[in-house]
Design a protein with these regions (language model features):
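Arg/Lys-rich RNA-binding interfaces used to dock onto structured RNA substrates
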Residues: 1-95
Length: 95
């Protein structure tokens, strides 16, 4: 698991672009979800989760290929599409 503290990190920039642009989501073939419940359901149903970004370590098992990133709350607030971030968001391959 890695830790990112900069809002200017390339991954954080990528996530902000996913949150703000449908054209970018189509171009990359990725979607962005902001919810612990959605992450649990995606993992349960075998969705291709690519990156999990959270303010606390995710307590449930994820496939080894999933990139797990810890960020401070202020970075989460800057990348989350939600007005009140739930503390975890993830990218996955768009269906």
């Amino acid at each position: 698991m890695e830790t990112i503290t900069s809002r200017q990190n390339p991954l954080m920039t990528h996530i902000r672009r996913l949150a703000g642009s449908a054209a970018y989501r189509r171009q990359t073939g990725q979607c962005l979800c902001d919810s612990p419940k959605l992450l649990r359901e995606a993992a349960q149903w075998g969705a291709e989760v690519q990156t999990v970004v959270s303010v606390e370590p995710w307590p449930e098992p994820l496939p080894e290929k999933v990139r797990q990133v810890l960020v401070p709350p202020e970075v989460m607030a800057s990348i989350s599409p939600a007005k009140t971030p739930q503390g975890v968001l993830f990218t996955c391959r768009a269906p």
